[in-house]
């Protein structure tokens, strides 16, 4: 299942994304973030992190540098802030 998710993202990156204007608000791009998140954290947690990232990608968010969290950090932990 993990390989299928990664393959789907790669197809998007190489076949669909080049036809669209590059306008991702974040670095790395959302598709690169999703790949790294799934490769680092697995399909379940990586997929959740990717969905949260896509939810933040809208015109009212300034964007910027947003790396995939490491294994020993959590976005929901008050200590990580």
UniProtKB/Swiss-Prot annotation:
Where do Polar residues bias regions lie? Answer: 70-81
Residues annotated as region Disordered?
A: 60-81
HAMAP family assigned to the protein according to its UniProt record, in alphabetical order: UPF0161_YidD
Transmembrane annotation, as ranges: none
Q: What is this protein called?
A: Putative membrane protein insertion efficiency factor
- GO CC: one term? plasma membrane
Q: Which family does it belong to?
A: Belongs to the UPF0161 family.
Q: What does this protein do?
A: Could be involved in insertion of integral membrane proteins into the membrane.
Q: Which InterPro entries match?
A: Membr_insert_effic_factor_YidD (IPR002696)
């Amino acid at each position: 299942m993990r390989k299928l998710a990664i393959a789907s993202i790669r197809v998007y990156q190489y076949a669909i994304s080049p036809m669209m204007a590059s306008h991702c608000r974040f670095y790395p791009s959302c598709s690169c973030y999703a790949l790294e998140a799934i490769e680092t954290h697995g399909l379940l947690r990586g997929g959740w992190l990717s969905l949260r990232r896509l939810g933040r990608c809208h015109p009212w968010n300034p964007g910027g540098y947003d790396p995939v969290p490491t294994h020993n950090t959590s976005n929901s932990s008050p200590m990580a802030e």
